[in-house]
Amino acid sequence: MKRLAVLCGALALDSCGLQPMYAGGGNGIVAHALADVSVPVIAGQQGWLVRNALIDRLGTSGQSSARYRLDVRLDDKLEGLGLLGNDTIARERRTLRARYQLVDSQDGKILLDATAGSDAGVDVVSSEYATIAAEQTALENLARVVADQIVAKVSLRLRSGGSTASQ
């Protein structure tokens, strides 16, 4: 009975057109489209981290002759939380937000206009070096998370082949 239910479920999924986004692996439609996205230089250390993470995930070299261009603007905030009795900060929150646009390089049309972001908590300890290292690690992790979010939305847009901006 279970086998029959699984078979019926598989047939139902097949008939609705559901398929993996990365069907075809490196030779699939999405992989080819992602490899044709250039990522211009993004200002600052956080920009360098996000751009490198995007290039790694897109499978591109950041070439300028690509069909699509991904313009990214970042907002990186570090704010103190949790004041102790002696007015020192016990915890910080690092927030990295990205506003990005996927632009068709051929006609300048904006295909996707969206945001991505994440935040991380950092404990402030008595060692200044340890706190700085924790802040840096948080930034590196946030850059990867934001890049993953951007690539997921760009992949969906390129897979759908839409030609209008969406959020």
Residues covered by each model-derived region:
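Acidic/histidine-rich, surface-exposed loop or edge segments in extracytoplasmic proteins
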Residues: 31-42, 127-130
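Post-signal-peptide N-terminal segment of Sec-exported extracytoplasmic proteins
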Residues: 36-69
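Solvent-exposed, acidic/flexible segments
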Residues: 43, 47, 51, 91-92, ...
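C-terminal/domain-edge helix-coil "capping" segments
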Residues: 133-167
